[in-house]
A protein has these predicted regions:
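N-terminal strand-loop element at the rim of the active site
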Residues: 7-15, 29-69
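Extreme N-terminal starter segment of soluble prokaryotic enzymes
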Residues: 1-4
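Conserved alpha-helical elements of sugar-nucleotide-dependent glycosyltransferases
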Residues: 15-26
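Short N-terminal targeting/anchoring amphipathic segment
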Residues: 59-62, 67, 79-99
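Conserved donor sugar-nucleotide recognition element shared by glycan-biosynthetic enzymes
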Residues: 19, 71, 75
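Short, well-ordered alpha-helices that flank and scaffold nucleotide-derived cofactor binding pockets
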Residues: 24, 28, 32, 80, ...
């Protein structure tokens, strides 16, 4: 199983366009059962909760409201949490796709 972590979009389902639509199209048109997507989702309320969307593991990150710097904090927090998941679940050779 190839685990792919997608970081940098606001999450799923797509509500904004651009990166979000790309991620939704990628996840919903997956061609191989051997690929498993983990998608970071920006949240104002929840932190480190998981839900399934179109077969992908979506996890929430509640980044602090820092104005334009919020997206940088969000990316860093999502990468850190993803690395924790990789270590905890002993995922070999994960792929990180940072948008």
């Amino acid at each position: 199983m190839q685990h792919v972590f997608i970081i940098g979009s606001r999450g799923l389902p797509a509500k904004y366009g651009g990166f979000e639509t790309f991620v939704e199209e990628l996840v919903t048109h997956k061609q191989s059962a051997d690929v498993y997507y983990h998608v970071a989702c920006l949240s104002d309320k929840e932190h480190h909760t998981h839900f399934q969307y179109a077969g992908a593991d979506c996890f929430t990150i509640k980044a602090p409201k820092l104005g334009p710097a919020r997206v940088i904090a969000y990316d860093m927090m999502a990468i850190n949490y993803s690395l924790q998941m990789v270590k905890k679940e002993q995922i070999a050779h994960p792929i990180f796709y940072v948008l």
